[in-house]
Amino acid sequence: AIARNGLSTGFAGKLGDDDFGRFLKETLEKEGVKVLCPELTKEAITTLAFVTLYENGERSFTFARKPGADMLLTKDDIDENEIRQAKMVHAGSVNMTKEPARGANLYAMKLAHDNGKLVSFDVNYRDTLWENEAACKEVADQVYDYVDFLKISEEELYFVGGEENIPAFMKEHGISVV
């Protein structure tokens, strides 16, 4: 949507050398998104997410990812010049479940923050991807000091001490929008 509105957009993530990875890469490029990690990996498949939407509006998620290409993103894949030229960097916890992708994302967010760029983060806790909630919370806790915009669901509010704690949490970490 950002690229369709004429803004410069990039995607820094690993894709597998498979039908889905090639499709995603081609689609992103067709839509005007610069693919910052253009080499497809043969080491893992492109991670797939399947969403089930129930009649009551609730959702459940199933992932094909053992391992997924997104988990193979490394610090070396992060182009420092692209981060320095960006106006904003967005990341989410989904591909921060394991190293080396966790470290690569932390590095990109810190680099963006240190260079005065806006940083957006989606807690996006998915129980099937993490050992437990505490593991996700521990990783998210490492991110907050770099974040300007925090996306968090009602179910994830305990990560920040509950809804009543949001103003204090924002002040403590310098977050502008939750």
Regions found by a protein language model. Give the residues of each.
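Conserved N-terminal subdomain of the carbohydrate kinase-like
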Residues: 8-93
